[in-house]
From Swiss-Prot:
It is found in: Cytoplasm. This is Phenylalanine--tRNA ligase alpha subunit. Its cofactor is Mg(2+). The keyword Protease does not apply. It comes from Xylella fastidiosa (strain 9a5c). One of its GO terms (molecular function) is tRNA binding. Pfam families: Phe_tRNA-synt_N (PF02912), tRNA-synt_2d (PF01409). Its EC number is 6.1.1.20. InterPro entries: aa-tRNA-synth_II, aa-tRNA-synth_II/BPL/LPL, Phe-tRNA-synth_IIc_asu, Phe-tRNA_ligase_II_N, Phe_tRNA_ligase_alpha1_bac, Phenylalanyl-tRNA_Synthase, tRNA-bd_arm. The keyword Aminoacyl-tRNA synthetase applies. GO terms for cellular component: cytoplasm.
Length: 333
């Protein structure tokens, strides 16, 4: 008999399929039973050796067994895959009661922090924040502010000029000129924003941020200026230190002064640091904006925001504020 006990082979094959514990084992069984040299395949190959009268009946039986085993293999494969999926879902289940992952939080740039801190302090002192154009004309940037024609600030190596005579503002003082032209005293305002100068090194940038303040009123004096700036500096740095006013020259103020603070360094030594410039508004400036200098006086001051940010946060190189190094910026988030 070429066909060996097909019933026994079928029973054993179905039992082995049902006992398969994983997909790899099941694949081994499939190859052993239905593969090119599998036991069922070999039975089909031997049909040609049977007498003609037996081939049809036995062939139908072997084909039926093959189909039965194929169905059993598919059913067992589906069951094993379902069991594997269920196990994976259990292993990877999400506990919805656990807190979610916190998203990364950004932070304000240190220059922005410093700008907001300065403007908030002056707002408490009654100063209005005013903005103006970054592209200026010669009148608002120089002439109205009493800059003589020979002043070095007008030179090409200090100022960025456009071909039509306009320029990138070198300070925010032009905002003060516009404000004084449109408003009548008493005035109390600050102007904040980007300014541009042709200079770049460790402590200078071709673009930086500046805040300038202005007060115009009857009987405003240098004493009021000193009191305002001393109060601001102590509020900004949150410490009580000595403040020194040194005579200096600025075309738009008379008298003018540089302001120094007694800064305590990391080794506990103290040295004077220049932090801003100021002075009483020059009568010519008041005249240029239509304010009677016989009735009104005023004072003005200006400071570099990056300079204050460097002091507050201990930054040695101004360029760090503009390099977008995430490692640096994360310190302020």
């Amino acid at each position: 008999m070429v066909i060996n006990d097909i019933e026994s082979l079928t029973d054993q094959a179905l039992a082995d399929v049902a006992a398969a514990q994983n997909l790899d084992h099941l694949e081994v069984l499939r190859v052993a039973l239905l593969g090119k040299n599998g036991s069922i395949t070999l039975q089909l190959k031997q049909l040609g050796k049977l007498p003609v009268e037996q081939r049809k009946a036995i062939g139908e039986k072997v084909n039926c067994v093959r189909d039965l085993i194929s169905v059993a293999l598919m059913d067992r494969k589906a069951a094993l895959e379902s069991a594997a999926l269920s196990k994976r879902l259990i292993d990877e289940r999400v506990d919805v009661t656990l807190p979610g992952r916190r998203g990364e939080r950004g932070g304000l740039h240190p220059v922005t922090r410093t700008l907001e801190r300065i403007t908030e302090i002056f707002a408490r002192l009654g100063y209005e924040l005013v903005e103006g154009p970054e592209i200026e004309d010669d009148w608002h940037n120089f002439e109205a502010l009493n800059f003589p024609l020979h002043h070095p600030a007008r030179a090409m190596h200090d100022t960025f000029y456009f071909g039509d005579g306009r320029l990138l503002r070198t300070h925010t003082s032009g905002v003060q000129v516009r404000y004084m032209s449109d408003h009548r005293p008493p005035l109390r305002m600050i102007a904040a924003g980007k300014v541009y100068r042709s200079d770049s090194d460790q402590t200078h940038s071709p673009m930086f941020h500046q805040i300038e303040g202005l007060l115009i009123d009857k009987h405003a004096t240098f004493v009021h200026l000193k009191g305002t700036l001393s109060e601001f500096l102590r509020a900004f740095f949150e410490r009580d230190f000595e403040v020194r006013f040194r005579p200096s020259y600025f075309p738009f103020v008379e008298p003018g002064a540089e302001v120094d603070i007694a800064w305590q360094q990391s080794d506990s030594s103290v040295r004077w640091l220049e932090v801003l410039g100021c002075g009483m508004v020059h009568p010519n400036v008041l005249k240029n904006v239509g304010i009677d200098s016989e009735c009104y006086t005023g004072f003005a001051f200006g400071l570099g925001v990056e300079r204050f940010a460097m002091l507050r946060y201990g930054v040695d190189d101004l360029r760090a504020f503009f390099e977008n190094d995430v490692r640096f910026l994360r310190q302020f988030s």
